[in-house]
């Protein structure tokens, strides 16, 4: 309940410090803090999702990335990578190393959009807001994706 977009949060403490508390390990005993993130964003259930895609691109991300609940089979909501939210998560968790997963999903896209800021009430900010309202609009940077597919035997 401490971080995220209230009331769409969990009562669990999901930050790195919560792991220390749960395991009974002193925070000063932790060396590196690895932040693992997807090359795109997903969300389960309701709640604000600034970069959510409601079009064919969102469907493709979901299908290619196999974004379905393991137990329920429920389709996850998919959207472009949100660097504002990622930066906030890095700060809150004290991340020292980043690991990106599911980058291979991007192989099927020529252009990738990344949210680098938000426009809220006519003002642009790269800070994560305490409250996400319908007035928020992501500001995107477009990237051309030219990396070869790791599934291509000629590149292995």
Predicted regions and their residues:
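A glycine- and small/hydrophobic-rich beta-loop-beta segment
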Residues: 22-120, 125-132, 142
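Conserved small/polar residues in nucleotide/adenosyl-binding loops
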Residues: 145-150
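Active-site loop-to-helix "anion-binding N-cap" substructures in soluble metabolic enzymes
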Residues: 3-5, 19-22
């Amino acid at each position: 309940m401490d971080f995220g977009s209230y009331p769409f949060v969990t009562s669990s403490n999901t930050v790195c410090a919560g792991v220390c508390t749960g395991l009974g390990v002193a925070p000063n005993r932790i060396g590196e803090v690895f932040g693992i993130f997807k090359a795109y964003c997903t969300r389960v259930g309701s709640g604000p999702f600034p970069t959510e895609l409601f079009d064919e691109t969102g469907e493709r991300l979901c299908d290619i990335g196999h974004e379905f609940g393991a137990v329920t089979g429920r389709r996850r909501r998919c959207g472009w990578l949100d660097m504002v939210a990622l930066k906030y998560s890095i700060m809150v968790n004290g991340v020292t190393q980043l690991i990106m997963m599911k980058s291979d999903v991007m192989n099927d896209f020529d252009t990738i959009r990344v949210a680098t800021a938000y426009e809220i009430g006519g003002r642009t900010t790269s800070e994560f807001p305490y409250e996400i309202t319908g007035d928020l609009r992501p500001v995107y940077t477009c990237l051309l994706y030219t990396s070869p597919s790791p599934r291509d035997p000629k590149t292995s």
